[in-house]
Every structure is written in C-alpha cells, then in structure tokens.
C-alpha cells in the first residue's frame, strides 16, 4: 500500500542520502559527493539504486528550479547501477500441485489458493472481506477494493490501492469458488483471512502463517547450539522427504523456494501460457503499466528454444542467392 511505499522511501532517504550528505549545505555538494554516496548502492539491487538515484535528482533538480543552486551536481550522474534483480520464476504445474497437497490442512491454504487462482497481491488478499466475494452469481468473482498494511505491527485496512488499475473485478475459477464457499460456511469474520478473533492479520501473524510453508521446504537453515557455554552457528539442509526430528509428522516435501509474490507471478504466467491476450492479462493482474505485463509475456513466450525453433526455421527457410 501507499503507507508502505512512504515508509520505504523515508528509510531510503535517511539511509542513503541524509546519512552521507546530511551535514552539508545543498550548495556545497559536488558531483563527486553524489558519486561517493552512491558507491554503497552499487552492491544493492538495481531497483534500490534507481530509487535512491531518483530521490537525489528530485532534491537537486527541485533546488535548481527554485534557484537555490548555481550548479546542479546531479547532472551527468548515470541512472543505471546496482545488481540486476533475480529472475522471477513461476511455479510449475507439478510444484503447484505439491504445494497445495502440502498445505491442504494448514492455515496458509486459503491464502495460497487465492494467490494462485486470482493473482491478488498480498495486501489485497489480507484486506479481502466477504462483501467483495461474490459466489452466488453465474460467474463468481472477487472485487478488489481494499488494501492491507501494518503500522507498528498492527493491521490497517484502507481503500487506497497500489494503483488505479488495482481496483477491479476478477472472475475466479471453480476450484477457488468451491474453496471460498467452504471457508465462508464456517467463517466468524468479515475478513476472508482472519485470526482466531476474526481480525485481519498483523505483520508478525502473517510471517507465522507463511512459516508453515518455509519449514516444509528443503531450504538451508541456520540454528545455534551451545557447546561448553559458547554459541556455535550451525547450518543444515533438509533432505526431501525427510522428517523434522522434534516433529515426525512434519515432512520436508517442498524441494523449491516459494514466496507469497510468486503465487501472483504464477497466476499471470499461467494466463499467458493459456493464450490470454496481454491486454486482458494486464487488466486481470491490475498492472497500471503495460510494460510490467509485457516483460512477463516476453519471458513466457521467448524463453524456451524448442518453442521458437519453428519460428526461426520459417524465417530463414527461403534459400538465399
């Protein structure tokens, strides 16, 4: 939500701009000072580098427009830097099946079903109320009208969505409609995802919810044990199909990483694989910018050589000379 964006931008401003440059007057800052301030960001993600770069330029271009500076030190500072982000991969059909089988009787099941089969963002799922879930109509759908965020670990539900395009009505497939009907029949809350008192989840509650997934994965984990009064850091990588020592019922069944956002990415990817045109996918995903949808489209359409072979052969089939 917007509250989270504001909080992140304030943190970025304090950590990467105020800390290195805050003791200087605007007019004292040189291009070299700006470059030095950006050096630590070269080891961060390209997205963070770009954000801080933009914030710096906002400050100095605004000062220049207001005639507070004779010289703008940001002129000529490259907007490119940082490490490229990891490529997001959608879950395969086999991984989706295994994930759902693993969590079927566990608390995250409904959250995961909504993510996989409606593509809602985490903040939209956690803010979803039953008054926006329409199940007794010829075409069941979810109406996206609210967003969740937390302040001091307390949930705040607002009608301010991430973008204008995020406000939409999403038709849902039968498997999700059936799942939601079952949940609604026993729900004591106006929220689809709620705690035991019927309230929306706090940040720490959501993290605990997602831990049901993490602890069943084969992801390497760190723990500490005490030997002769000293704390020693140990690492362990669970074996697929193995069991947790303290809890034999817990099986390490997920041999892949999965994040909440990956559910949404999988939904979008599956629509594109099914041949849904990108403009419709843009609407269903609530993407304000078509570039976001087209980047995923390009990844889906062009990342498999075997799918492109016929196109390449057709392009170069005519004899030359």
Give the positions of each predicted feature.
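Short, small-residue-biased leader/transition segments that mark boundaries at the very start
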Residues: 1-6
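N-terminal DNA-binding recognition helix of tyrosine site-specific recombinases/integrases
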Residues: 12-16, 23-39, 43-77, 121-123
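Short, basic (Lys/Arg/His-rich) helix/loop patches that form interaction surfaces
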Residues: 46, 101-106, 118, 170, ...
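Basic, Lys/Arg- and aromatic-enriched nucleic-acid-binding interface segment
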Residues: 46-54, 65-130, 136-138, 165-167
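Conserved tyrosine-mediated DNA breakage-rejoining catalytic core shared by Y-recombinases
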Residues: 78-79, 95, 128-183
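Catalytic-site neighborhood detector that most strongly recognizes the C-terminal catalytic loop/helix
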Residues: 90, 148, 177, 285-310
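DNA/chromatin major-groove-contacting recognition/catalytic segments
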Residues: 97-102, 153-158, 274, 295, ...
């Amino acid at each position: 939500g917007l509250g989270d964006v504001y909080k992140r931008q304030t943190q970025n401003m304090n950590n990467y701009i105020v800390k290195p440059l805050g003791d200087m007057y605007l007019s004292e800052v040189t291009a070299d000072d700006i470059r030095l301030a950006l050096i630590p960001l070269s080891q961060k993600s390209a997205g963070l580098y770009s954000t801080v770069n933009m914030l710096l330029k906002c400050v100095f271009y605004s000062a220049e427009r207001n005639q507070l500076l004779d010289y703008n030190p940001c002129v000529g500072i490259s907007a490119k830097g940082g490490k490229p982000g990891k490529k997001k991969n959608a879950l395969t059909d086999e991984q989706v099946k295994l994930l759902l089988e693993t969590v079927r009787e566990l608390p995250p099941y409904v959250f995961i079903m909504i993510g996989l089969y409606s593509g809602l963002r985490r903040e939209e799922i956690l803010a979803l109320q039953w008054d926006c879930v329409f199940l007794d109509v010829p075409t069941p759908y979810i109406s996206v009208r609210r967003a969740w965020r937390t302040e001091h670990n307390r949930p705040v539900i607002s009608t301010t969505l991430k973008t204008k395009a995020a406000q939409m009505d999403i038709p849902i497939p039968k498997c999700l409609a059936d799942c939601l009907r079952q949940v609604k029949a026993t729900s004591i809350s106006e929220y689809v995802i709620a705690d035991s008192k019927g309230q929306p989840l706090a940040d720490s509650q959501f993290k605990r919810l997602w831990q049901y997934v993490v602890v069943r994965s084969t992801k390497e984990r760190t723990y500490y044990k005490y030997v002769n009064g000293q704390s020693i850091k140990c690492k362990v990588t669970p074996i697929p199909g193995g069991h947790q020592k303290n809890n034999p019922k817990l099986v390490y069944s997920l041999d892949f990483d999965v994040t909440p956002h990956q559910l949404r990415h999988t939904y979008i990817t599956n629509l594109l694989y099914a041949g849904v045109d990108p403009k419709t996918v843009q609407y269903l995903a609530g993407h304000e910018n078509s570039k976001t949808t087209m980047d995923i489209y390009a990844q889906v359409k062009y990342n498999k050589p075997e799918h492109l072979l016929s196109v390449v052969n057709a392009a170069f089939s005519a004899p030359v000379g």
